Structure formats: structure tokens, C-alpha cells
């Protein structure tokens, strides 16, 4: 203890080192939030904090919150309340709340949960260390940096995904202002991260053993328009492909209307880029798309999907839909069902509409009963289940490169992913083998069977990058 105090006294307030002080970090919400969490964790670890997975042991707890939909908001509030209990039941000295819920409800959090020592906005992660300093001195702080300017990317991140895939957040904020979405108000306008910053961060991740980069943002397709005056995602991708050690590069959150020829060509021609795109289309009824504030028509969506499949025949397309949006009639729902049946997306998720305060959609007339929303969601997912099963059956007999993620307990089998599957949201391939494999290995696997969303296979031959 004496050594710890003496060493800490050698540093100024903004450089204080916390030797052997435990921190528990809870990251809620999307993969973009996870990137923020890993950046904050990296800063804390560099200052001497030791990360623990036992919240009762922690002297500092940080909750990075989400409030995108009602359920996420409730989860975040409950998480803060649960962590606040450790002020009396554990070792907790400082409780820090950050993220989207903190940005949106800073006054309410401070008033209703007095155990919270600091509230940081979505653009204030750089202030975390100072906030911890103040909290450990018994001082309450609130930091809300304006939602503008080039996103600041701090030093080395702490990888929490297992070490072999990582998300690379290429932009912050959003300019779309869809009528159901609060993100522009809590994340600000669209701001690209400079290309050289992203390349340096990607190199650091590769040096730490990362083999798959997954590019994320509220919208990836317009990357660079604010910095370079033109869409530059294809240029960023080409630079990332040059990094040694990276085997796969995957792109999520591509708004369909912003996909452009150079991007398609780059995805098609660069060997490291997975032939996989995530296209959040939300609906197919022109009337509902207009009410949502989307910028595409159903025919444009059909044309975009057709172009992608023509130019990249083995491309895997994922999309997300919202059902039960205000004013959605049974005819609108049936039109969406027909569209899904026609398009046969490889991967598809469906959310029921969640009214968010301070959004235009929340005050629209003709709100849909929750039971109807859930029924429509179930119908869409039942249809997609049939499509997925048929597509899986077509994979039987083919060989795929697979990244191993782990071993099935008590069985001679491993779990992995093909290029067609993004982590956490898509399916897996279960590989039966007596060979010893490690997480992060790449193997060539032969598909012997299929399930509704997953594949079954065996080793064809090992692949080493």
C-alpha cells in the first residue's frame, strides 16, 4: 500500500496512476458502443487499473449505456440501479455513467440515482480519466462535449471480443433524421474518422492478433464525404487490405441508396473483403418508407439488390426490417411479406416499432397495437426461416473457409463462421473433428448438413494465413 501511494504521488492529477485498483466495465447496446467502451478501457488500463469481471470487487464501475429502443433504455436503467447497489454492498467508490442514455437523460440520472458520481455524454469519453479522479475525491462531475468536430480516437484499445475479430468505427453521428430514430440528437451530425487514424488503429489491432476487421458506423457508405468531398469507403478498404495479418474485412450498415460503383468493384475485386453486405432497408411499402423518412422506393431497393447479385454472384445480403410502424396497414404488411419472399435475403432481422420520445413517429396517428406488431414480426421471421433453410440446403456439398471461434463443450466439435456470417447476429458452422484447433484458426470445411440458420461440416484441409 505504501508503494502504491508513493508511486501515485509522483504523477500530476491528470496522470495519476491507479495501481491494483479494480474496475468493472459494462458495455450495453450496439457494436459502435462497444468500440467506445474498448477505447475507454484501454485508457483506464494504461493508467494502471485492473479489469475485473466481478462487480462486487470493483472500486470503480463504468456503465456505457444505450437508449436506441425502449427495451435498451430499460436495460440501461436497470444496469445503473444494479451497479449503484455496490456502493453499500461492495467496494464501489465511483460509479460513472456514459453513452446514449447519459447523453439523453443526464438531469434525470443525476436526480433519480444519487449514487452516480459522473455522467459523461457520447462525445466526452476523453474526459473519463478526469471524471474518475474527481469521483474518487468525492466530487460529482458532468461532462458533455458538443456533438461536433472530428471524432477523437484515443490510444490502444482493450480487445474484448475474444481477440480475433474487432469492430472498426469509421464515423460518428448521422445526418439522415429518420422519423423513428433519436440517434442524430444524441450522437450529432455525421463525422468521419480520418483515414490515417483508422489505418493506424487497424494496424494496432492486427499486431494484437486480430484477423477480421468489421467496419461500422451509423452509415458506412458515405464515409469521407465530410472530410474529402466524396465517398471514400472504397479507398479506405483498399488501404486496409494492405495490412499484414488481416484475413477478412467485413462492412456493416450500408445504406442501399448510397452504394456506388467503385465500392461494388472494390468489394468484388479485393480478396480480403468478405462478399457480404448489411443493408438496413426497414420496409418495402413506398408509403411507409416515406413516413419513415427513408430515401428509397421499393423498386430502387429491388434494383440495388439485383445489381449487387449480378456484380458479385456469391454476395451474402443481410437486412433489418421494422414492423408495426405507425400507419402500417395489413396491405403494407402483406407487401413487405411479398418483398421478402421475392428478394430472399440471406440474413434478415425484424424489430417491432418502438416509439421514442422527441421523434416525429412517436406522435404520428394510427399507432399499431403491440400484439399486432408481434404477430407481424412472427410472420416475417417464419417466412425468413423457410428461406434460410432452403439457402442452407444449397450449401451442402460445398467447401468454405471458416474462422474457428471455440470448441463445443464435451464434444469433438468446434464452432466457426464463414464469410457469410457476421459475429453475434448471424449463424455458425459446427465442425466435427478430432483435430486440435484454436480460436482464430482458419480451416477449410466441407458442408455435410444444414439447420435453419447454421451449417454442419467437417475438415476438408487446414488453411493457414
Please state what every model-predicted region is.
Residues 198, 215, 251, 279, ...:
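Conserved, mostly hydrophobic/aromatic
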Residues 16-223, 262, 277, 299-310, ...:
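Proteins enriched for Cys/Gly/acidic motifs involved in redox and nucleic-acid/cofactor modification
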Residues 67-68, 187-188, 227-230, 290-296, ...:
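Short glycine-enriched, charge-decorated loop/helix-capping segments at active-site entrances
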Residues 363-465:
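Terminal RNA-binding accessory module
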Residues 95-97, 104, 207-333, 341:
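Conserved SAM/AdoMet-binding glycine-rich loop
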Residues 3-5:
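Cysteine-centered motifs
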Residues 8, 12-14:
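Ala/Thr-enriched low-complexity intrinsically disordered regions
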Amino acid at each position: 500500500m505504501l508503494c502504491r501511494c508513493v508511486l501515485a504521488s509522483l504523477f500530476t492529477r491528470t496522470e495519476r496512476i491507479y495501481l491494483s485498483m479494480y474496475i468493472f466495465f459494462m458495455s450495453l447496446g450496439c457494436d459502435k458502443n462497444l468500440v467506445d467502451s474498448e477505447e475507454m478501457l484501454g485508457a483506464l488500463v494504461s493508467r494502471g487499473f485492473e479489469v475485473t469481471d466481478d462487480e462486487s470487487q470493483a472500486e470503480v464501475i463504468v456503465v456505457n449505456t444505450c437508449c436506441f429502443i425502449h427495451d435498451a433504455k430499460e436495460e440501461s436503467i436497470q444496469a445503473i440501479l444494479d451497479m449503484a447497489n455496490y456502493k453499500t454492498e461492495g467496494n464501489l467508490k465511483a460509479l460513472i455513467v456514459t453513452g446514449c442514455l447519459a447523453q439523453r437523460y443526464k438531469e434525470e440520472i443525476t436526480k433519480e440515482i444519487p449514487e452516480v458520481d459522473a455522467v459523461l455524454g457520447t462525445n466526452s469519453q476523453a474526459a473519463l480519466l478526469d471524471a474518475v479522479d474527481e469521483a474518487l475525491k468525492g466530487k460529482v462531475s458532468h461532462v458533455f462535449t458538443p456533438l461536433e468536430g472530428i471524432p477523437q480516437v484515443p490510444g490502444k484499445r482493450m480487445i474484448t471480443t475474444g481477440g480475433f475479430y474487432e469492430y472498426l468505427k469509421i464515423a460518428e453521428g448521422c445526418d439522415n433524421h429518420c422519423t423513428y430514430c433519436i440517434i442524430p440528437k444524441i450522437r450529432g451530425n455525421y463525422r468521419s474518422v480520418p483515414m490515417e487514424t483508422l489505418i493506424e488503429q487497424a494496424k494496432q489491432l492486427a499486431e494484437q492478433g486480430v484477423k477480421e476487421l468489421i467496419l461500422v458506423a451509423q452509415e458506412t457508405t458515405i464515409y469521407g464525404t465530410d472530410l474529402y468531398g466524396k465517398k471514400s469507403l472504397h479507398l479506405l478498404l483498399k488501404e486496409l487490405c494492405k495490412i499484414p495479418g488481416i484475413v477478412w474485412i467485413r462492412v456493416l450498415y450500408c445504406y442501399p441508396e448510397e452504394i456506388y460503383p467503385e465500392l461494388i468493384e472494390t468489394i468484388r475485386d479485393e480478396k480480403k473483403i468478405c462478399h457480404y453486405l448489411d443493408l438496413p432497408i426497414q420496409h418495402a411499402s413506398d408509403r411507409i418508407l416515406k413516413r419513415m423518412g427513408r430515401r428509397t422506393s421499393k423498386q430502387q431497393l429491388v434494383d440495388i439488390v439485383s445489381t449487387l447479385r449480378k456484380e458479385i454472384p456469391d454476395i451474402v445480403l443481410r437486412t433489418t426490417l421494422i414492423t408495426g410502424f405507425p400507419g402500417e396497414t395489413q396491405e403494407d404488411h402483406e407487401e413487405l411479406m411479398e418483398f421478402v419472399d421475392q428478394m430472399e435475403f440471406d440474413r434478415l432481422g425484424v424489430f417491432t416499432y418502438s416509439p421514442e420520445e422527441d421523434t416525429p413517429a412517436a406522435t404520428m396517428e394510427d399507432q399499431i397495437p403491440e400484439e399486432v406488431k408481434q404477430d407481424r414480426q412472427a410472420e416475417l421471421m417464419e417466412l425468413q426461416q423457410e428461406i434460410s433453410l432452403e439457402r442452407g440446403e444449397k450449401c451442402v456439398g460445398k467447401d468454405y473457409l471458416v474462422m474457428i471461434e471455440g470448441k463445443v463443450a464435451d464434444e469433438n466439435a468446434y464452432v466457426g463462421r464463414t464469410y457469410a456470417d457476421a459475429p453475434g447476429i448471424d449463424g455458425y458452422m459446427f465442425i466435427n473433428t478430432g483435430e486440435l484447433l484454436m480460436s482464430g484458426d482458419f480451416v477449410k470445411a466441407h458442408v455435410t448438413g444444414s439447420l435453419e440458420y447454421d451449417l454442419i461440416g467437417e475438415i476438408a484441409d487446414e488453411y493457414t494465413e
